[in-house]
């Protein structure tokens, strides 16, 4: 052992051990919360992806019908006049100290941004469903980003937990035991020396 077997070092190491155990408990709780959050996010992403797939299928069916009814060029002309959708905003929140994105979507506007009398129901439906799909794509992207960030943090936390559990805490315990054993041995030797000294004085 490289640590001198003194009572001062013993006290310091016991304090380090207490802090290491506290750190281990905190990190383990953090990892548990993150893993619980991940399970919920993965389940949410799965449901959204299923909804997104069915929404795209519905949108493309409506678009195909509009293309047949109005012609591809007319549909493209209407599409080029649709304003950019800017009703989404990304903000950040914290999950156990990990910064994760959240999406804010303003009230979904159902108003058609072109003259309805010049189109047909299929094109109107395609527009509305593609708007819904855009919102779902944004939600899925945000959730996937959250999953990536939290999974990365969970991996880092697991490494720290393993280091504390398998290396740092056992090493501290071993060093403490070594110092305690050494101090006890020195104490026994000192008692034996004093006993011998008393015996010599008594003769």
UniProtKB/Swiss-Prot annotation:
Q: Which domain of life is it from?
A: Bacteria
Instruction: Report the record's disulfide bonds.
Output: none
Protein name in UniProt: V-type ATP synthase subunit D
| Any GO MF annotation of the entry | proton-transporting ATP synthase activity, rotational mechanism
Q: Which gene encodes it?
A: atpD
Q: Which family does it belong to?
A: Belongs to the V-ATPase D subunit family.
Q: Which GO terms describe its biological process?
A: proton motive force-driven plasma membrane ATP synthesis
Say what the protein does: Produces ATP from ADP in the presence of a proton gradient across the membrane.
- Coiled-coil annotated spans: none
Q: Which NCBIfam families does UniProt cross-reference here? A: V_ATPase_subD (TIGR00309)
Q: Which UniProt keywords apply?
A: ATP synthesis, Hydrogen ion transport, Ion transport, Transport
Q: Which HAMAP family match?
A: ATP_synth_D_arch (MF_00271)
